Curated annotation (Swiss-Prot):
Biological processes per GO annotation: caveolin-mediated endocytosis of virus by host cell; fusion of virus membrane with host endosome membrane; virion attachment to host cell
GO cellular component: membrane; viral envelope; virion membrane
Organism: Hepatitis B virus genotype B1 (isolate Japan/Ry30/2002) (HBV-B)
The gene coding this protein: S
Origin superkingdom: Viruses
Compositional bias (Polar residues): 96-106
Family membership noted in the UniProt record: Belongs to the orthohepadnavirus major surface antigen family.
Applications: Systematic vaccination of individuals at risk of exposure to the virus has been the main method of controlling the morbidity and mortality associated with hepatitis B. The first hepatitis B vaccine was manufactured by the purification and inactivation of HBsAg obtained from the plasma of chronic hepatitis B virus carriers. The vaccine is now produced by recombinant DNA techniques and expression of the S isoform in yeast cells. The pre-S region do not seem to induce strong enough antigenic response.
Domain notes: The large envelope protein is synthesized with the pre-S region at the cytosolic side of the endoplasmic reticulum and, hence will be within the virion after budding. Therefore the pre-S region is not N-glycosylated. Later a post-translational translocation of N-terminal pre-S and TM1 domains occur in about 50% of proteins at the virion surface. These molecules change their topology by an unknown mechanism, resulting in exposure of pre-S region at virion surface.
Function statement: The large envelope protein exists in two topological conformations, one which is termed 'external' or Le-HBsAg and the other 'internal' or Li-HBsAg. In its external conformation the protein attaches the virus to cell receptors and thereby initiating infection. This interaction determines the species specificity and liver tropism. This attachment induces virion internalization predominantly through caveolin-mediated endocytosis. The large envelope protein also assures fusion between virion membrane and endosomal membrane. The middle envelope protein plays an important role in the budding of the virion. It is involved in the induction of budding in a nucleocapsid independent way. In this process the majority of envelope proteins bud to form subviral lipoprotein particles of 22 nm of diameter that do not contain a nucleocapsid.
Membrane spanning stretches: 182-202, 254-274, 349-369, 376-398
Protein name (Swiss-Prot/TrEMBL): Large envelope protein
Lineage of the species this protein comes from: Viruses, Riboviria, Pararnavirae, Artverviricota, Revtraviricetes
């Protein structure tokens, strides 16, 4: 084989007039298989070269659009391999041997007495009796049976049809009662949650009023800020947990909450005593312990003994009551405990623990109060997300 040619390049890689669909073999110094020799080193000057007459044909061949290889390519001499698309007729489907295909005849309907037993009640006699009903005749015939007149109002029509056909079919549920039964608890729940959010703002408002008494004429500023806990300036009613004044804010709100609870108890005591619901026997001022009024319900007889003071009334034959006065708060607490014990039977298991807790020394009580003041803020932060669930549980307990 010859080496590189010294004359200008005229090979397939440079002569654009010669089709070169694949673009490789830059110098085309091929082997003697194509009769290349030193006299005709270039492919373009070889008289025995194959001119690739099929290379000018552009079509879908074995190598994709525009790449139709000559000499049949890799897939042979078929028309598809040469890039010629031919349509092959599809073979017809085999004849069906299923004689049952196609529309089948409609099956016979079951008897009416099996599908609609309620319709069997309307026999000819019942139908004629219904037509004789004045309410039905009023739907189609005017008053007096003449062909002129006015038709009954629509509400009479509906009531007549509903009253006549009420004996057949299943009763329709009253959706109005169902909706009202669900709407009531939802309204109570919404009102309870709204009231709770407003009640929770009362201690904060009273705390703001309390702290404003120490800053007359100025803006209240928390005095608990120091170098050990550098925090931004804030109001004493909005101390963060890292502020030293946070525990004092919690103590103020705890006292405010106790005062609000005391006012609510006084109001409830006055209301229940006015309605005669408290198990406390009345005492007339300036008189003896014997009252001439009617006896109220008493939980402990007069001759019985109790470790706590209670109102004991007896009802002798003359109708008088012998009463021992006690604080109304204890009577109210006992009344609430009895009411809750009836509702929740498991509360009776707490009686020994409550009696033991009440019998503790004042030192233990002071220790408990101190622990509540010390750990109360952290417990409040833990339990505060669950506060809105209390009215929800209460509504579920009342309505379920």
């Amino acid at each position: 084989m010859g080496g590189w040619s010294s004359k200008p390049r005229k090979g397939m890689g440079t002569n654009l007039s010669v089709p070169n669909p694949l673009g490789f073999f830059p110098d085309h110094q091929l082997d003697p298989a194509f009769k290349a020799n030193s006299e005709n080193p270039d492919w373009d000057l070889n008289p025995h070269k194959d001119n690739w007459p099929d290379a000018h044909k552009v079509g879908v061949g074995a190598f994709g659009p525009g790449f139709t290889p000559p000499h049949g390519g890799l897939l042979g001499w078929s028309p598809q391999a040469q890039g010629i698309l031919t349509s092959v007729p599809a073979a017809p489907p085999p004849a069906s041997t299923n004689r049952q295909s196609g529309r089948q005849p409609t099956p016979l309907s079951p008897p009416l007495r099996d599908t609609h037993p309620q319709a069997m009640q309307w026999n000819s006699t019942t139908f004629h009796q219904t037509l004789q009903d004045p309410r039905v005749r009023a739907l189609y015939l005017p008053a007096g049976g003449s062909s002129s007149g006015t038709v009954s109002p629509a509400q009479n029509t509906v009531s007549a049809i509903s009253s006549i056909l009420s004996t057949t079919g299943d009763p329709v549920p009253n959706m109005e009662n169902i909706a009202s039964g669900l709407l009531g608890p939802l309204l109570v729940l919404q009102a309870g949650f709204f009231s709770l959010t407003k009640i929770l703002t009362i201690p904060q408002s009273l705390d703001s009023w309390w702290t404003s008494l120490s800053f007359l004429g100025g803006t209240p500023v928390c005095l608990g800020q120091n170098s050990q806990s550098p925090i931004s300036s804030h109001s004493p009613t909005c101390c963060p947990p890292i502020c030293p004044g946070y525990r004092w804010m919690y103590l103020r709100r705890f006292i405010i909450x106790l005062c609000i609870l005391l006012l609510c108890l006084i109001f409830l005591l006055v209301l229940l005593d006015y309605q005669g619901m408290l198990p406390v026997c009345p005492l007339i001022p300036g008189s003896s312990t014997t009252s001439t009024g009617p006896c109220k319900t008493c939980t402990t007889p007069a001759q019985g003994t109790s470790m706590f003071p209670s109102c004991c009334c007896t009802k002798p034959t003359d109708g008088n009551c012998t009463c021992i006065p006690i604080p109304s708060s204890w009577a109210f607490a006992k009344y609430l405990w009895e009411w809750a014990s009836v509702r929740f039977s498991w509360l009776s298991l707490l009686v020994p623990f409550v009696q033991w807790f009440v019998g503790l020394s004042p030192t233990v009580w002071l220790s408990v109060i101190w622990m509540m003041w010390y750990w109360g803020p952290s417990l409040y932060n833990i339990l505060s997300p669950f506060m809105p669930l209390l009215p929800i549980f209460f509504c579920l307990w009342v309505y379920i």
